[in-house]
């Protein structure tokens, strides 16, 4: 049985391993560790099934629009061990993370991800809400937003800016 819970300090090495195995490189694992060390505002969850088998991280994203700053969250990265993928673990992580963010009053969540996966959670192309990705070359269909508070997002448009640490990911 999969248990989704908040990351604990003793999970750090296993989270690193899960990210490295899922992505086939250390860049995402390095990013998670850097964000953890800088104390970034985040929600970090693990999927546990006789050990950590998945991880998801949400960190703050800012949209500057008409002189105001709207703070939301960005989903990245999400990782599931390769031999545990396609079993619904990633979906459980996303759903629990979004539930927590709704409870906290987060107005929006953005993701750069697979356009066949994230729409099942309500994500739509961010451009349809007037939001743009800070990185050039990201396909329009891959940069998505889930608006959690339509009132807070009314009239908001502009560039969604992730934490600077994301610019270091190769």
What are these regions (language model features)?
Residues 1-33, 38-53, 74, 143, ...:
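Short amphipathic alpha-helix that is part of the acyltransferase structural core
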Residues 103-107, 112-138:
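Conserved active-site alpha-helix within GNAT-family acetyltransferase domains
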